Amino acid sequence: MKNKILFILTLLMILPLSSCYNKENREEILKVYNWADYIDEDVLANFPAWYKQQTGKKIRIIYQTFDINEVMLTKIERGHEDYDVVCPSEYIIERMLRKDLLLPIDTAFGKTPNYLKNVSPYIVEQIDATSNNERIAHHYAVPYMWGTCGILYNKVHVPLKDAQTWGTLWNRKYRGKLLMKDSYRDSYGTALIWAHRKDLEAGKVTVPELMNDYSPNAVAMVEKNLKALKPNIEGWEADFGKETMTKGKAYLNMTWNGDAVWAIEEAKNVGVEL
């Protein structure tokens, strides 16, 4: 059963919470909080000059990265960081809207006014599902990329027949050989999907319904399944899993499709089959 977990990354405008930059004009600073490896360093280095050429104004970029959505949210909420733009997964939008942490965005997009018209209606629908208190999510967030979560495996140690379902993660043949993504959303969803696999196959429930089920029974089921998974887990990773897999040091990695593609291509260069 090849059920996949959808994730959508978005760009958001953050409600200013503080502004202490001594003599520097805050309007001349662009603070960005993003996942690592998402924007090329050359783009960041060249942006101030490009911006000056386009607008006649100077800008300085403060660029910081995170590897876990909840860490990002905590830093903004409790640390009172006044980022201008952040890039969380879609389920975080609902929390940020509820906590009044976001500002509406200008959807004209400069020289690309048709940007939103070309976005998949399905993606916009998924984002708007996080709308809160009459605040339409796509008024506060712009789709940046989307993907799925799945299993990356070493072909030498894991035969194809073993890699057909989420149950691969619980297979005791791979004790101590599994890297799990350090993302509660993905781990939670994976555990529920596997637990309800028969209901999914029978059409009694959908993946989105499971992903948003936080009832006591669902939480208890996730706890039970993740505890059963523990013997197989070599470690929890937010970013290093793809490199570990390219070195052949782990057999399985529950990971995001972008990281999986990168790892597969890199592994070819060193003779590792993923």
Question: Where do the PLM segments sit?
Answer:
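Paired acidic/hydrophobic, glycine-rich loop segments that form the ligand-binding mouth/hinge
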Residues: 83-88, 234, 251-256
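A ligand-binding cleft/hinge motif common to bilobed small-molecule-binding domains
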Residues: 92-95, 252-272
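Local beta-strand N-terminus motif with an aromatic residue
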Residues: 83, 174, 250, 271-273
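Extracytoplasmic ligand-binding site segments that recognize negatively charged/polar headgroups
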Residues: 38-41, 97-249, 263
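Early extracytoplasmic/lumenal segment of secretory-pathway proteins
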Residues: 21-99
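Sec-dependent N-terminal signal peptides
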Residues: 6-11
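Positively charged n-region of N-terminal signal peptides that target proteins for export
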Residues: 1-4
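C-terminal motif of bacterial Sec signal peptides marking the signal peptidase cleavage site
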Residues: 16-19
